[in-house]
Amino acid sequence: THLIKLIKQECLKENDRIYDLDIVMPGEEGVVPGVVEKMEGVEYIRLDVRKEITFDFKPTEDDIIFNLAAVHRTPGHPDEAYFETNILGAENVTAFADRYGIKKILFTSSIAPYGAAEELKTEDTIPMPNTPYGISKLTAEKIHMIWQAEDDTRELTIVRPGIVYGKGEHGNMTRLYWGQRKRYFMYTGRKDTIKACIYVKELVRFFKYRMIDNDFSGVDIFNCTFEPAFTIEQIVETMKKVTGIQRT
């Protein structure tokens, strides 16, 4: 939703079309709390990325795919669900791009391929995933890389964001807030655990900068988190300060 709004506000030209392919349609309850928002000028198509992608589509030389599909909340799903969605999804998205000659893909991966650690990670750090989510995301990255390697004019950006927070996110940050608000949050051990994160509007603005404002060829990987990263205590204290929550 944030990405579509930004594209509509700043990038859309005459005759451009936006397709939102999703398993959940506007007006329906999504995989996170709340009803999916419908926006004017967007063509919504119900689609399961785990299956072959087929719909009435006329390609242009300016087409861009933003592949955001994933099973990502962890823990919370059976192990096979991560592999089924993240790997089959990557195969079907790249097959669709190949079929229609689309040369630009942005794929949202995760910092999970690095594995659980608190040392600073760079894009050159060797991935060592230790969860089904991280393993499946790294595999999906490689599937996209194979697609790019088949034609050196293709453009692939792989983004590895940390915790994404903001309106409509309903993930870790939202649960942390409500845990404090309802008085059932407590530190289970350390207060200095690092929580690498990024604001959703900053993330989609980077998507636009990378894929729409610039042209490049090849493959690039970008970690997307604020630096320096915040600790869980810093995040909790900031939430308390701006919302007036009092802990007793």
Residue spans of the language-model regions?
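Glycine-rich NAD(P)-binding loop of the Rossmann-fold in SDR/ketoreductase-type enzymes
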Residues: 81-92, 127, 135-138, 198
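SDR active-site strand-loop-helix element
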Residues: 21, 65-69, 105-111, 159-161
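Conserved Rossmann-fold NAD(P)-dependent oxidoreductase catalytic core, especially the SDR/UDP-sugar
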Residues: 92-132, 152, 157
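Substrate-positioning beta->alpha
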Residues: 169-175, 189-212, 219-220, 234
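Mid/C-terminal beta-alpha module of Rossmann-like enzyme folds, strongest
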Residues: 210-248
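NAD(P)H-binding glycine-rich loop region in Rossmannoid oxidoreductase-like domains
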Residues: 47-85, 96-99, 114
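N-terminal Rossmann/SDR dinucleotide-binding element
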Residues: 1-64
